[in-house]
């Protein structure tokens, strides 16, 4: 961080690649959904980087994309039913990832929990870069079952619900 500060940097953004342990993020094929710092890359975790940034007078930001998941992740292994995916059909992957079904309140709680944990453990995080930029493919909500017509509306409402909870915190 000191070298960055010496160059005039006033904010450091930790981008994609900092997370997952069982399937560490090395490229876009694994790890998305497992939002814990990779121990081999960041032995002091996010708190260590935030402390270093604060000591040197650099603001710290972090990249997240908590509404997405790679099939090669612990989250997908535990909760394949949390993914927007048509049953008994070929799955289309956009950038080797799938969209979580944020119309599902359990998924909303999970996504909120990711941001809440980072903010709670690292109150000096100044900035979140939340991509939320994927198209929705494989359109089918396991949560809605027979009521698929409400999916898009409830998906957007789910995102708003998560953002409202974050804002209130």
Place the predicted regions along the sequence by residue.
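Active-site-proximal loop/turn and secondary-structure-junction residues that shape catalytic pockets
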Residues: 18-20, 64-70, 132-136
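Catalytic cores of extracellular degradative/oxidative enzymes
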Residues: 2-6, 20-52
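Short, solvent-exposed loop/turn and secondary-structure capping segments
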Residues: 23-25, 72-75, 139-141
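Hydrophobic faces of well-ordered beta-strands that scaffold small-molecule active sites
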Residues: 10-14, 60-64, 128-130
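Non-catalytic terminal segments and appended small domains
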Residues: 20-24, 28-29, 69-70, 80-89
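Active-site neighborhood of glycoside hydrolase catalytic domains
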Residues: 38-57, 77-169
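Catalytic domains of carbohydrate-active enzymes, especially glycoside hydrolases
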Residues: 1-21, 121-123
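Glycine/proline-rich, flexible active-site/cofactor-binding loop segments
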Residues: 59-81
